[in-house]
Structures are given as C-alpha cells and as structure tokens.
Amino acid sequence: MTDPGTDRPGYRRVLLKLGGEMFGGGKVGLDPDVVETVAEQIAEVVAGGVQVAVVIGGGNFFRGAELEERGMERARSDYMGMLGTVMNSLALQDFLQKQGVDTRVQTAITMGQVAEPYLPLRAKRHLEKGRVVIFGAGMGMPYFSTDTTAAQRALEIGADVVLMAKAVDGVFDADPRVVQTATMYTEITHKEVIERGLKVADATAFSLCMDNQMPILVFNLLTKGNIARAVAGEKIGTLVRS
C-alpha cells in the first residue's frame, strides 16, 4: 500500500462507471429512487464546473455471461445486455434533465430516434459546454464488458480518471463481506493490484488503464455525496494509479 498521506488531485473531466445492478436496487428492472439519487449527485458535481461522462452496465436487465451458461449464444446475449444499458442510460438522462442538467446519450449501436451515435469529438464538445454525456450500448460489440467500455471511452475523451462506483467502500485485501478483518487500501499501484490478485475491474479494462496510466478510483456510490467527494480529491475509496 502506498502512503495514505499522498495528496489527491481534484478532477476536471471524469468518466463515471455505474453498475447496472445498482440501478435495479438488487432487483430486475429500475429503482427510480436509486436513479434519482445518482442524478442528484451528478447534478451537484456538474454545478461545480466538472465535466462528467457516464457508462452504465445493464446487469439489472440482462447479463450476457449468465444467459450463455443457460445455452444462449454469447454474442446474442451480449447484444441483449447492450440494450439494457441503453434503457438505463435513457432513465438517467431523464432524471438528470429533471435536475436541470442538459444531457446527451450516445450509443455504440445506431438508434437515431432515441440517442446520438457515439462520436468522440462531439462528446468532447458536449462536455465542454457543461452537458453530461452518457455512453450506452457498451462497445457495440459482443465479448466486451461495460468496464472495458468505461476504460476505452475515458481514454478517448481525455478523462482525468475513471470513477468506479461500487457497493463497497474501496479495494480490500480480502472480501469484507466474508472476512471481518479485511483491510482497505487507500492507494495502490496498477502493478500491485496484479501482483496481489485484487479485483478492481475486468482484465481487459484494467490492462487498458494500466498501459495508458489512467487512474481508477473505486468508491462506494451508496454513501450520498461520494461522487462530489471523489471529484474534489477527498480521500475516499481506493485510488489506483501508476
């Protein structure tokens, strides 16, 4: 573990990765209360002048890997999962608009009646104008997770950090739900994560971040105000950097 006293920077442009399961409140479908709370937190950050892009999973609707285990072709089940991410994206867009935050959804699969196509230069312009950009439909290709989408989009739009929102406080040396004495890392390097066999994101996403020196901040979304704290550089969660 690196020195917990190391200063953290505040961030100007962030990529927020949200798990789809959180949007469902642990159930299939959408929990409006959860989506509203997330929208309120994002609106607070945007009001402070931070540029925010978002990638949401689709696990509250479909999980491609699980459907594959039941005999469905993996590619088809992944496409179903991508559609789930679009439903989540549109829901978050609606709640953000109600907060007075101008929001655009860009999808990797063309669906012109509900969203813009993914265009990184346009996404950057939206961010510069203070709009939130939500990236839906994953990478638009099967076999790639939304973690990987988050890493790739963060790199392409020039984000300062990937904010990995979880239902736990950060990265631990053991599962805190099983081991009561598990210790949370305040800060750790990409290399140390691999050496210690810790789980931060899937392997492809993590490799993208490590190879391109993209920091990852893992934090608990369920604590209200944590998105603003993370963006401001407060010492919450676990910061993974080179």
Swiss-Prot record:
Record-listed UMP binding positions: 58, 78, 139-146
UniProt superkingdom: Bacteria
Keywords: ATP-binding, Cytoplasm, Kinase, Nucleotide-binding, Pyrimidine biosynthesis, Transferase
Activity regulation, short description: Inhibited by UTP.
Binding, ATP: 17-20, 59, 63, 172, 175
Biochemical pathway: Pyrimidine metabolism; CTP biosynthesis via de novo pathway; UDP from UMP (UMPK route): step 1/1
EC number(s) given by UniProt: 2.7.4.22
Primary location group: cytoplasm
Reactions this protein catalyses: UMP + ATP = UDP + ADP
InterPro entries tied to this protein: AceGlu_kinase-like_sf, Asp/Glu/Uridylate_kinase, Uridylate_kinase, Uridylate_kinase_bac
Cellular component, GO annotation: cytoplasm
Pfam families reported for this sequence: AA_kinase
Location of this chain's protein in the cell: Cytoplasm
Function: Catalyzes the reversible phosphorylation of UMP to UDP.
HAMAP family assigned to the protein according to its UniProt record, in alphabetical order: PyrH_B
Quaternary structure, from the entry: Homohexamer.
Similarity annotation: Belongs to the UMP kinase family.
Protein name as annotated: Uridylate kinase
